[in-house]
Swiss-Prot record:
Subcellular location: Membrane
Organism from which the protein derives: Homo sapiens (Human)
Effect of G369S: Found in a family with prostate cancer
Extracellular membrane side: 77-451
Membrane topology: Single-pass type II membrane protein
Protein name from the UniProt record: Macrophage scavenger receptor types I and II
InterPro entries hit by this protein: Collagen (IPR008160), SR-AI/II (IPR003543), SRCR (IPR001190), SRCR-like_dom_sf (IPR036772)
Keywords: Coiled coil, Collagen, Disulfide bond, Endocytosis, Glycoprotein, LDL, Membrane, Phosphoprotein, Receptor, Signal-anchor, Transmembrane, Transmembrane helix
PANTHER family: MACROPHAGE SCAVENGER RECEPTOR TYPES I AND II, SRCR DOMAIN-CONTAINING PROTEIN
Length: 451
C-alpha cells in the first residue's frame, strides 16, 4: 500500500506539470462593445482603433505561439521522462507483487483490477486537468476582457469628451472667425469713412488756406493803404496848418488895414448945410455883406462842472513822438566775464544794388553766405517799407518790378513775400521757401527809399 500511495503521488506530480495557456480570440472579440454611432469621424476613428487592436492581438499571437510550442516540447520531454520513471516503478511493484505467485488466479485478477483502476485514475486526472485549465483560461480571459472592456470604455469616454471639446473649440473658433469677419468689415467701413473724412478735411483745409491767403492779401493791401493814407493825412495836416497860418496872417493884415481906414475916415470933416425936410421912406434895400469878425471878447467865468459823459470809442493810434531826452546815467554795472577776444562787426543782410544812390536799387538778400535777388511776384509797398526800414530809411518812396535796376547774377532766393509793414526785417515776413526756380532775373524786384 505504501508503494501504491507513492505511485499515486508521483502520478499527480507528473500530471500537474503539464499546464498550458490558451487564448480565445472569438471570446475577446465577443466581449468588445459595439461601435458607437456618434459621428462619421468618430466611427472612422473607432474602426482604425479596432484594426490596430486586432493587429496587436495578431502580433501577440504570432510571438506567443512559437514560445508556447517550445515550452510544450520541453514539457513533453520532461513528462515522458517522468512517465518512464513512473512506469519503471510500477513494473517493479508489479513484479514484486507477482513474484510471490505467478500461477495464482488472484494475482491475475488483482492485476486486471489494478490496470482498470489505473486507467480510471488517469482519465479522472486528465479530466481534472482539463477542467482546471479551462477554469484558469476562463478566469484569465474574463479578467482580461473586463480590464480591456473597462479600458476601452475609458478610451471611448475620453474620445467622446475629446470630440465634444473639439466640437466646442470648433464652435468657438467659428464664432471667433465670424466676429473677426464682422470686425474686419467694420474696420474697412471705418477706414473708408476715415479716408472720406480725411479727403473732406483736406479739401476744407485747402479751401480755408486759400481763403486765409486771400484774406491776408486783403489785410496786407488794406494795411498798406492805411499806412499810405496816414502818411497823406500827415502831409495834408501839415499843409493845412501852413495854409491856416498864412490865412491868419492875411486876416490880421486886413483887420489892421480896416482899422487904419476907419481912423482916416473919422478924421475927415465936411461942411454941412442945414438939414432939409425928411424925404419919403425908401424901399428896403438888399441885405448887406456881413462885416468882419470882431476881436474876441474877454474870457468869461468858468461854468459849472458837467456830468461825466459816456466813454467814447478809442481813437486812431497817433504818430510816434519825438525821442525824449536821454536820462541820467545809471549806476555802474558789475564787471562782465572775459570774452573770447574775437570782435564781429554787425552786417546787414539786405542791400540795394544798381541805383543812382544808396537809397535805391535792386534788392539783394544774403542767405547761406551768398547774395541773391527777390522775385517781383506780390512785390508791394509794405514789403518795400520793411526793406527801407531795415536799411535805416524812414519809409519807401516807390517799389519797382521787372528788373528796373538791372538783372542780378546770383540765385533767386525769395518769391511771393508777405509782409504787414510793421516787421523790422524781411526775414520776419511770411516766406514760403528759400530758393525758387519759378522766376528769372528779368523779374528782379527793386525799391526806392525816402531820404
Amino acid at each position: 500500500m505504501e508503494q501504491w500511495d507513492h505511485f499515486h503521488n508521483q502520478q499527480e506530480d507528473t500530471d500537474s506539470c503539464s499546464e498550458s495557456v490558451k487564448f480565445d480570440a472569438r471570446s475577446m472579440t465577443a466581449l468588445l462593445p459595439p461601435n458607437p454611432k456618434n459621428s462619421p469621424s468618430l466611427q472612422e476613428k473607432l474602426k482604425s482603433f479596432k484594426a490596430a487592436l486586432i493587429a496587436l492581438y495578431l502580433l501577440v499571437f504570432a510571438v506567443l505561439i512559437p514560445l508556447i510550442g517550445i515550452v510544450a516540447a520541453q514539457l513533453l520531454k520532461w513528462e515522458t521522462k517522468n512517465c518512464s520513471v513512473s512506469s519503471t516503478n510500477a513494473n517493479d511493484i508489479t513484479q514484486s507483487l507477482t513474484g510471490k505467485g505467478n500461477d495464482s488466479e488472484e494475482e491475475m485478477r488483482f492485476q486486471e483490477v489494478f490496470m482498470e483502476h489505473m486507467s480510471n485514475m488517469e482519465k479522472r486526472i486528465q479530466h481534472i486537468l482539463d477542467m482546471e485549465a479551462n477554469l484558469m483560461d476562463t478566469e484569465h480571459f474574463q479578467n482580461f476582457s473586463m480590464t480591456t472592456d473597462q479600458r476601452f470604455n475609458d478610451i471611448l469616454l475620453q474620445l467622446s469628451t475629446l470630440f465634444s471639446s473639439v466640437q466646442g473649440h470648433g464652435n468657438a473658433i467659428d464664432e471667433i472667425s465670424k466676429s473677426l469677419i464682422s470686425l474686419n468689415t467694420t474696420l474697412l467701413d471705418l477706414q473708408l469713412n476715415i479716408e472720406n473724412l480725411n479727403g473732406k478735411i483736406q479739401e476744407n483745409t485747402f479751401k480755408q488756406q486759400e481763403e486765409i491767403s486771400k484774406l491776408e492779401e486783403r489785410v496786407y493791401n488794406v494795411s498798406a493803404e492805411i499806412m499810405a493814407m496816414k502818411e497823406e493825412q500827415v502831409h495834408l495836416e501839415q499843409e493845412i496848418k501852413g495854409e491856416v497860418k498864412v490865412l491868419n496872417n492875411i486876416t490880421n493884415d486886413l483887420r489892421l488895414k480896416d482899422w487904419e481906414h476907419s481912423q482916416t475916415l473919422r478924421n475927415i470933416t465936411l461942411i454941412q448945410g442945414p438939414p432939409g425936410p425928411p424925404g419919403e421912406k425908401g424901399d428896403r434895400g438888399p441885405t448887406g455883406e456881413s462885416g468882419p469878425r470882431g476881436f474876441p471878447g474877454p474870457i468869461g467865468p468858468p461854468g459849472l462842472k458837467g456830468d461825466r459823459g459816456a466813454i467814447g470809442f478809442p481813437g486812431s493810434r497817433g504818430l510816434p513822438g519825438y525821442a525824449g531826452r536821454p536820462g541820467n546815467s545809471g549806476p555802474k554795472g558789475q564787471k562782465g566775464e572775459k570774452g573770447s577776444g574775437n570782435t564781429l562787426t554787425p552786417f546787414t543782410k539786405v542791400r540795394l544794388v544798381g541805383g543812382s544812390g544808396p537809397h535805391e536799387g535792386r534788392v539783394e538778400i544774403l542767405h547761406s553766405g551768398q547774395w541773391g535777388t527777390i522775385c517781383d511776384d506780390r512785390w508791394e509797398v509794405r514789403v518795400g517799407q520793411v526793406v527801407c526800414r531795415s536799411l535805416g530809411y524812414p519809409g519807401v518812396q516807390a517799389v519797382h518790378k521787372a528788373a528796373h535796376f538791372g538783372q542780378g547774377t546770383g540765385p533767386i532766393w525769395l518769391n511771393e513775400v508777405f509782409c504787414f509793414g510793421r516787421e523790422s526785417s524781411i526775414e520776419e515776413c511770411k516766406i514760403r521757401q528759400w530758393g525758387t526756380r519759378a522766376c528769372s532775373h528779368s523779374e528782379d524786384a527793386g525799391v526806392t527809399c525816402t531820404l
